[in-house]
Regions:
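Signature of extracytoplasmic/envelope-associated structural regions
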Residues: 1-317
Length: 317
């Protein structure tokens, strides 16, 4: 008896294309995205029946609404990460620099784009397509010596299983990763070397509870909401400087820079307040302090609670 071929993760790929009209899959513009993993899928509950029929046997269940969502882990790289930033913030403001360099600035805007995602299992000619996809959350963690990645939570509208890809000639991008060891950080506008780690969480406030009658259980639309920006800074406990900012509610700022040759990624939090969180004595080793924070927009000239500046050789996104 012959054994059917099984899809292999190494042979699979994730292709993303931005939609001109929400939920409408384009036929061109696909970009093959480098990823570590993707749990994007559609799930549908079966609801138990409460019908009484004169027998102890259960009646057939009914099908519920369909949730297309999941978490994607991409590397933080020189070219590809710009597409994730575009999904989060929309098209950047791009300017040409010296030589072949281009600077792309991503900020919080009035709306978010949508995209079609395709998980292609080419060894079994099956293509799992999700339309009307928006980014729900982004999480980044800096510090340590592990591979630098992001966690991207997405929410979509419709899943379609196809035998051919929506774009037969997607763009293949060069993969050049940023690394933790290339990071520098400023706190309050001053470069510091006592910070162990920085976590950043961005919640885009999506409303996925939009199941209209007549759409076969799929979402009809995904509305955007107010963005939440928070995180935690972990530093050596050397003095009271950080803790005093939390105690007094003093506004501060953070700026993290990653470099790779002539390429760079700068993340700015122009306005933030630390949450009061005193250190403790956990043992005989050095004492650290963890400072949760919330970023916001008040009166900074950038007019964005968080912004990303990506410099690379790509002309536009």
């Amino acid at each position: 008896m012959a054994v059917a071929k099984r899809a292999q993760g190494a042979q699979s790929k994730l292709t993303m294309a931005f939609e001109t009209d929400f939920g409408v899959t384009p036929s061109t513009g696909g970009v093959v995205m480098p990823i570590i993993s993707s749990s994007l899928k559609a799930s549908q509950n079966l609801n138990d029946s409460n019908v009484i029929r004169g027998t102890r046997n259960p009646a057939a269940p009914s099908r519920g609404n369909i949730d297309a969502s999941g978490s994607i882990t991409p590397p933080v790289d020189v070219i590809g990460f710009g597409y994730w930033l575009k999904l989060a913030f929309g098209a950047p403001t791009s300017t040409a620099g010296a030589g072949s360099a281009h600077k792309h600035v991503f900020k919080i805007g009035p709306d978010m784009p949508s995209a079609t995602f395709e998980q292609g299992y080419k060894d079994i000619s099956t293509y799992q397509q999700f339309s009307g996809v928006r980014m729900n959350k982004m999480a980044l963690n800096f510090g340590g010596d592990s591979e630098l990645t992001a966690t991207i939570d997405v929410m979509g509208c419709k899943e379609t299983m196809a035998a051919v890809p929506f774009d037969t000639a997607p763009t293949q991008i060069a993969f050049t990763p940023f690394e933790n060891l290339e990071a520098t950080i400023k706190e309050g506008g001053v470069t510091v070397a006592n910070i162990l780690s920085l976590s950043l969480n961005i919640d885009f406030g999506l409303d996925g509870d939009s199941y209209a009658i007549g759409n076969k259980g799929f979402r009809t639309y995904i509305d955007t909401g107010i963005v939440g920006v928070s995180g935690t800074l972990k530093a050596f406990f050397q003095n009271m400087d950080l803790l005093n900012k939390a105690v007094n509610g003093t506004e501060s700022s953070l700026e993290l820079t990653l470099t790779k040759g002539d390429n760079s990624l700068v993340i700015k939090l122009p306005e933030l307040i630390y949450e009061r969180n005193s250190p403790g004595i956990d043992g005989p080793k050095g004492v650290n302090i963890e400072m949760p924070f919330k970023a916001y927009y008040g009166d900074d000239s950038e007019q964005s609670a968080v912004l990303f500046e990506l410099t690379n050789t790509q002309a536009s996104y």
